């Protein structure tokens, strides 16, 4: 079991309130497997891993903002590609049904 000193993690972030917000955001990423842990998992829960990452200075609020922004851009690109793909399928289906009829 990992020992995490909340005070050390709070000192890295600035205060306990921002620590809770940052740790919750990071733990959610880890829980949903959106991002891989930056420290060994050691059979710890996502919240403990998030706190360990913060304590080591690997994660903070601005890093979380950057990660979430890049994830949002990646998601938007994937959605646009899916829309384009579906539009192509519909166009081709219409073309073939028009030429067959």
UniProtKB/Swiss-Prot annotation:
PANTHER family: DNA-DIRECTED RNA POLYMERASE SUBUNIT OMEGA (PTHR34476:SF1)
Protein name from the UniProt record: DNA-directed RNA polymerase subunit omega
Domain of life: Bacteria
Function recorded in the entry: Promotes RNA polymerase assembly. Latches the N- and C-terminal regions of the beta' subunit thereby facilitating its interaction with the beta and alpha subunits.
Matches recorded under Pfam families: RNA_pol_Rpb6 (PF01192)
Gene this chain is encoded by: rpoZ
Enzyme class: transferase
InterPro entries for this protein: DNA-dir_RNA_pol_omega, Pol_omega/Rpo6/RPB6, RPB6/omega-like_sf
